[in-house]
Amino acid sequence: MLQRASTAMDMKLEHVGKAALAGALAVGLAAAPAQALTKSQLNELSYLQVKGTGLANRCPEVVGEGSISPKSGQKLVDMCIEPKAFAVEEEIGRAGKTEKKFVNAKVMTRQTYTLDGIEGTLDVSGGSIVFNEKEGIDYAATTVQLPGGERVPFLFTVKDLVAKGSGGAFKPGFQMGGDFNTPSYRTGLFLDPKGRGGTTGYDMAVALPGLQSGVEGDEELFKENNKTFDITTGRIEMEVNKVNVEEQEIGGVFVATQLGDTDMGSKVPKKVLTKGIFYARVD
């Protein structure tokens, strides 16, 4: 049975603010990566020139350090969000104590994990800028691997993002951040290896039907049968470090936290941390 719940799981997201963004800058995310191209340079390339190069998974570079003062009703368009580093929160045992710590992970997904074509409205009032995400390629199924070999799937996304920043202009040092929704990694039409799904498939696996009802306390089997569509909450913080006034472009770095896959309600999700760069154009 498909269950929607906008607050299906409570998240205690670690505060990601200026310190995290400073860390992203310290590891060189703000620097122009090798082979980075501007939007105009990318537009000049043909399909065959882009094919197989990985450029389609890259965000454009912004050149300049000016200032753009948007007005209410304008939009941010062509937004691109490219993760450069991934980490997963794990429990680390040391000296008889257990602590939670983010462990660096390796991305296993081929070059299809960058969000692109995102757009949304801008609201400028009271000395602040608010960005409301509306549409675009705003989610990407991604899998990362921990040092021990465990793989963690998650839906990299910024769906329904509402990001707010203090100030009336996009300029180097401008920061904005907010919460977004993270839909389920799987949809209701997905069938597990035993043919069970959220909106289709079997209600339960064969054998031991009495235990699978949950009545007799077999919670693990019940969760495997009772598929849910969990919507959780993530958070992203962004800092502008490049502004091209002539092209009305902004670029910078971001740090985001969100929950990973719940396997449709049958397992506890892991917290995933992503760091990278972003690009957008004021329209």
What is each PLM-predicted segment?
Residues 1-35:
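N-terminal chloroplast transit peptides
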Residues 28-283:
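An extracellular/secretory-lumen and virion-surface interaction module
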